[in-house]
Structures are given as C-alpha cells and as structure tokens.
Amino acid sequence: MNAHNAALGGTPQRLKRGIPLALRGVARRFGEREVLKDIDLLVPAGQFVAIVGRSGCGKSTLLRLLAGLDQPSRGELLAGSAALAEAREDTRLMFQDSRLLPWKRVIDNVGLGLRGDWRAKARQALRAVGLAERANEWPAALSGGQKQRVALARALIHEPRLLLLDEPLGALDALTRIEMQQLIEGLWREHGFTVLLVTHDVSEAVAVADRVILIEDGEIGLDLPVELPRPRSRGSARLAALEAEVLNRVLAQPELPPQPEPVSPLPTQLRWAL
C-alpha cells in the first residue's frame, strides 16, 4: 500500500504535519469600515482552531484571507517562515454549500480536476468518509450530510496540510451535525492537518477544537484553550463551563451589520469551488 492509500484507507498514519500559521498585523478594510484590525495570531502545526463571533465580526473575512480568496489591506499571512500563498496547493476550503456538480456522479465530484489514474484514490477518500457504496450515484440522491461528506472526501484526496472550514455543518440537522463533527475530528486526529473552523455554534467549537478564538468587532477578544481529553463527553460539566464562558462573552457584544462580500477573480472562485 502506498503512502497516499494508507492515508485515506489503510493503517492510520500522520503522513504530513499540518501547516503552522502566523498572522502579523493583518487588517482588512472595505471602504471606511475596517472589518479586521491588526490581527496577530500564531497557530502551531496540526492544531484545531475554532473561530466564533457574532455575524459581521470578521470571522469569515479572516478565513477568506487565509484561503487566498481575498487580500489583506495590510499585514502578513505566513505558513511557517514563507508566505501563505506558497502553501495554496496544500490548502483546501469547505463551505456550508457542498458545491457538488449535479451533472457529475459522486466519484467524479471527488476526483474533479485530477489527472491520471485517480479513481482508486477517490474510492478510498469516499471510504474514509463512509460513502464508498455511493460512488456511482448522482448528488441529487444524497442527503445534505452525505453531500458534505463528499465535499470532505474531495478535500481529503488532495492530502491537505491546512483545512479551512467555513460553517460547513450549518445547514445540517442536529444529529447529522454531531456525526459530521465526529468524522472531521477523527480524520484530523488521523492525518494531523491544521484546521481552522468558522462556526456560529459555540457548543460545536468547544466540542471539537483545541482552542476557541472569539472575534469581536474585528479583533481577537478571547483566545481560549480547550484542554480536555478526547473523545469529549458533550454532557460534561467542564465542557458546559467552557461553552458558557464563550457564550457570555459573545452575548455581551452588539450585533454588527454584515460586511460586503468581495468578488474574487473568476479562476480563484472556481478553484475553491472544486
């Protein structure tokens, strides 16, 4: 079994360390409004970070900067000592919408953009997310949770070192959401990539992350380590206390108007839809 196959379908291996991230004085302005204000942040390789905050606080803007879908007004985005732009091939982004192409079968969506003999790898990626038997079906036959599993398989086939998650579970029912949280956490523990998850769900953040970052009016208002053993018991008093600490801070902040959505060049938009 080769290294790629082992990563997706065989004995768990941490084949690649995640990407270490450094943000230095990162800001983003839209007209007169500064959505992000001189963000300084260090994320060690392989850490699972959840980013929470009220609508309009700047958390999705931050993820777009990390994905290369937008550019900062000032500041630096680094992967280790190099520019983050140099790590684009090792970075994948998942959205709330699975963005599957309805005219392509499931396996073809997973292998989208790949060349050569990719079908075996695509099947292994589908096996890793529990959908090997749905490979030849159309996306229309899948539930919302299954579509997100396909989107996750599409990311896994590229062996990402940095996985960016922009509310990927927001449209799912509660039970499916928990199942997907457990799947993502399990794959992260197996492969060791760095994860940044943007979510409105504070309970989700403290359940899966090593660290919860609260964005308040474009600044880091809280940086909370979640030092609890895994797998975590969702009914535990410690988890509830951490959730309450974050929620109390979030609820103390006023709701902000949504920031404008920047339009990236078409090739970049297409790249992250794949």
Swiss-Prot record:
Q: What residues does ATP bind to?
A: G53, R54, S55, G56, C57, G58, K59, S60
Query: What is the reaction catalyzed?
Result: ATP + H2O + aliphatic sulfonate-[sulfonate-binding protein]Side 1 = ADP + phosphate + aliphatic sulfonateSide 2 + [sulfonate-binding protein]Side 1
Asked whether the UniProt record includes Cell membrane among its keywords, one would answer: yes
The cross-references to NCBIfam families, in alphabetical order and at most eight, read: PRK11247.1
Taxonomy of the source species:
Bacteria, Pseudomonadati, Pseudomonadota, Gammaproteobacteria, Pseudomonadales
UniProtKB keywords: ATP-binding, Cell inner membrane, Cell membrane, Membrane, Nucleotide-binding, Translocase, Transport
Q: Which InterPro entries does the record match to this protein?
A: AAA+_ATPase (IPR003593), ABC_transporter-like_ATP-bd (IPR003439), ABC_transporter-like_CS (IPR017871), ABC_transporter_ATP-bind (IPR050166), P-loop_NTPase (IPR027417)
> Which Gene Ontology CC terms are recorded?
plasma membrane
EC assignment: the record states: 7.6.2.14
* UniProt gene name: ssuB2
Q: What family is this? A: Belongs to the ABC transporter superfamily. Aliphatic sulfonates importer (TC 3.A.1.17.2) family.
Q: Which organism is it from?
A: Pseudomonas aeruginosa (strain UCBPP-PA14)
Q: What is this protein called?
A: Aliphatic sulfonates import ATP-binding protein SsuB 2
The main place the protein resides is membrane
Q: How does it sit in the membrane?
A: Peripheral membrane protein
Quaternary state and partners of this protein?
The complex is composed of two ATP-binding proteins (SsuB), two transmembrane proteins (SsuC) and a solute-binding protein (SsuA).
